[in-house]
């Protein structure tokens, strides 16, 4: 009959399932090769339904044709060697065949904390993994729709680097075909993870030029290199897009397996998400675009968009562009780039609670400068916010503990007659003015906030490789010596001793096992989450001990 205990156990079981997460401190990516390697011909994966002209160009396996690029546009000999670009926050490689970004490193985010000189690799087009950003010109006259294959661009240099004191870096790739000169321009800014990709079309032919710009992200089905989980709950790995009706719409790999998606949107964005990092194409806000997902002939997943028709009269010039973001999920930056893009920091269905929590945590960090201490202060503030609810819960538990001898007497009196025992217990609760749900409901009310905080600590890139003190050098991975999980288990045991013993023997056994079960689960939890739980437990113990002692003292005084 103990409804409160049943609900509490169920709630703990739900929390256990949601929060059981094992982290892997190996982010599994190698650095970019230091030497120029031959670029393999990559499939552009032109969006379905976009006119490919009358030449029947293949959308899956294009081939490069150097003869289509005139020598006068090539300051150096045409080459298929990758073009290297380095800024203060990006290291990338561009394939001259099509001008796709096929490799990209993030030097400000090391692959591992103990290897600070090996950057995390976001894009790769090697043998083990496929993840790249593609763009091009398709349509009736687009060079990416030619039967001879995608254009082979020429660059003035084989490598480019943002120099000290330089705020912007521009990389131009050039190509000419049938009297039309193309410049594919990559514009980088110091300290920024977004870059502008533009096409300058100079039509020197004797007729009008018509085409469309497309931009897309292509990825295989490999796992997330920045995260690994032990049970069914994981951070989202998949595509997402903006629509007029949904500012953040997920499109998982399973969704793409079931069939292609095609929507007409004005502006918007398309993105690929993984733990801590996001890649997004952001077209001009005024453009009417066709957003599409599909799977190519090699089994890779594609999300992208095709822009409106571009018309360039004979002798005319036109420029079209899109923004590419490839980097960490920094909410303030993402929000500046496009509406809804900050939602790619996926806090789950409780995002509306999680975002204010992160805002508060960020402001605390701006004062303290340490994410560990910030978590502690945030936990104290949240605990203070819910102090009245927690106090009501602990008072109910204290009263339950005070009547525990009477409950034991009822059990001995009625034995296995559960119906009579339940009736007698309800009469006792009524007499003692105890609400059997009084201790549980406040906990359930607080649970959404605690779960939202869990997702904040899990998903925020700011926690990645953030140190606290002493042996805790990374709050996003497990405690290397399991000290915090053991302390957490001890605090759970102490807190359990303050609670009344359940009258049902089975429930009592389950409750006794909870500290052991949670300690085992928390061995692999990120240290930041365990730190939150330890601080929360310590505050709960102090509050519960104080309330319990006061009620017990008042009970003894009344009895005397």
From Swiss-Prot:
What are the GO cellular component annotations? plasma membrane
Q: Name one Pfam family in it.
A: 60KD_IMP
Kindly list the places in or outside the cell where this protein is found, as annotated in its UniProt entry.
Cell inner membrane
| Keyword terms | Cell inner membrane, Cell membrane, Chaperone, Membrane, Protein transport, Transmembrane, Transmembrane helix, Transport
Q: Which GO terms describe its molecular function?
A: membrane insertase activity
* Regions that span the bilayer: 1-21, 341-361, 367-387, 437-457, 468-488, 515-535
Give the main localization category.
Answer: membrane
Asked if the Swiss-Prot or TrEMBL record annotates the protein with the keyword DNA damage, the reply is no
Q: Which domain of life is it from?
A: Bacteria
Decide whether keyword Cell inner membrane is in the record: yes
Q: Where is this region: Disordered?
A: 42-66
Stated membrane topology is:
Multi-pass membrane protein
| Biological process, per Gene Ontology | protein insertion into membrane; protein transport
Q: InterPro entries, per this entry?
A: Membr_insert_YidC (IPR019998), Membr_insert_YidC_N (IPR028053), YidC/ALB3/OXA1/COX18 (IPR001708), YidC/Oxa/ALB_C (IPR028055), YidC_ALB_C (IPR047196), YidC_periplasmic_sf (IPR038221)
Q: Which HAMAP family match?
A: YidC_type1
What is the protein's quaternary organization?
A: Interacts with the Sec translocase complex via SecD. Specifically interacts with transmembrane segments of nascent integral membrane proteins during membrane integration.
Q: Which family does it belong to?
A: Belongs to the OXA1/ALB3/YidC family. Type 1 subfamily.
Which NCBIfam families does this chain map to? PRK01318.1-3, PRK01318.1-4, yidC_nterm, yidC_oxa1_cterm
Job of this protein: Required for the insertion and/or proper folding and/or complex formation of integral membrane proteins into the membrane. Involved in integration of membrane proteins that insert both dependently and independently of the Sec translocase complex, as well as at least some lipoproteins. Aids folding of multispanning membrane proteins.
Give the protein's recorded name. Answer: Membrane protein insertase YidC
Q: Name the source organism.
A: Pseudomonas putida (strain ATCC 47054 / DSM 6125 / CFBP 8728 / NCIMB 11950 / KT2440)
Lineage runs:
Bacteria, Pseudomonadati, Pseudomonadota, Gammaproteobacteria, Pseudomonadales
Gene assigned in the entry: yidC
């Amino acid at each position: 009959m103990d409804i409160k205990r049943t609900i509490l156990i169920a709630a703990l079981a739900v929390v256990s399932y949601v929060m059981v997460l094992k982290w892997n401190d190996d982010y599994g990516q190698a650095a970019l090769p230091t030497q120029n390697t031959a670029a393999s011909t990559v499939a552009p994966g032109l969006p379905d339904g976009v006119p490919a002209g009358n030449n029947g160009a293949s959308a899956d396996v294009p081939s490069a044709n150097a003869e289509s690029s005139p020598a006068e546009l090539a300051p150096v000999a045409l080459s298929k060697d990758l073009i290297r670009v380095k800024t203060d926050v990006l290291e990338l490689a561009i394939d001259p065949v099509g001008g796709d970004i096929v490799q990209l490193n993030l030097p400000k985010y090391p692959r591992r904390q103990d290897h600070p000189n090996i950057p995390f690799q976001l894009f790769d087009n090697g043998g083990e993994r496929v993840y790249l950003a593609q763009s091009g010109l398709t349509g009736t006259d687009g060079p990416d729709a030619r039967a001879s294959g995608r254009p082979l661009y020429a660059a003035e240099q084989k490598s480019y680097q943002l120099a000290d004191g330089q705020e912007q870096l521009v990389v131009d790739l050039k190509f000419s075909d049938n009297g039309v000169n193309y410049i594919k321009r990559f514009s980088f800014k110091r300290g920024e993870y977004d870059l502008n990709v533009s096409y300058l079309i100079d039509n020197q032919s004797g007729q009008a030029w018509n085409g469309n710009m497309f931009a897309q992200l292509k990825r295989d089905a490999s796992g997330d290199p920045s995260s690994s989980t032990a049970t069914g709950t994981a951070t989202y790995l998949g595509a997402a897009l903006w629509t007029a009706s949904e500012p953040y719409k997920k499109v998982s790999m399973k969704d793409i397996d079931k069939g292609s998606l095609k929507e007409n949107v004005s502006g918007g964005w398309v993105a690929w998400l993984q733990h801590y990092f996001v890649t997004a194409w952001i077209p001009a806000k005024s453009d009417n675009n066709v957003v599409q997902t599909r799977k190519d002939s090699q089994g890779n997943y594609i999300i992208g968009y095709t822009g409106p028709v571009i018309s360039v009269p004979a002798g005319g010039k036109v420029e079209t562009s899109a923004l590419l973001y490839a980097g960490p999920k920094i909410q303030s930056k993402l929000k500046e780039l496009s509406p809804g893009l900050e939602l790619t920091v996926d806090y789950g269905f409780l995002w509306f609670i999680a975002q204010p929590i992160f805002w508060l945590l960020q402001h605390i960090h701006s004062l303290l400068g340490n994410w560990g201490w910030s978590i502690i202060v945030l936990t104290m503030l949240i605990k203070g916010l819910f102090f009245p609810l927690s106090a009501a819960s602990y008072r109910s538990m204290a009263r339950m503990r005070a009547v525990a001898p009477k409950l034991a007497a009822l059990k001995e009196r009625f034995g296995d007659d559960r119906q009579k025992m339940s009736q007698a217990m309800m009469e006792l609760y009524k007499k003692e003015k105890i609400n059997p749900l009084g201790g549980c409901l406040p906990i359930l009310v607080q649970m959404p906030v605690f779960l939202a905080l869990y997702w904040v600590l899990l998903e925020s890139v700011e926690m990645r490789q953030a140190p606290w003190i002493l042996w805790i050098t990374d709050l996003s991975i497990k405690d290397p010596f399991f000290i915090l999980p053991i302390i957490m288990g001890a605090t759970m045991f102490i807190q359990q001793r303050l609670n009344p013993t359940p009258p049902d023997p089975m429930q009592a056994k389950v409750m006794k096992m909870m500290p052991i079960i949670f300690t085992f689960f928390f061995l692999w939890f990120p240290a930041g989450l365990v730190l939150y739980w330890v601080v929360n437990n310590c505050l709960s113990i102090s509050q519960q001990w104080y309330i319990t002692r006061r009620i017990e003292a008042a009970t003894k005084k009344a009895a005397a």
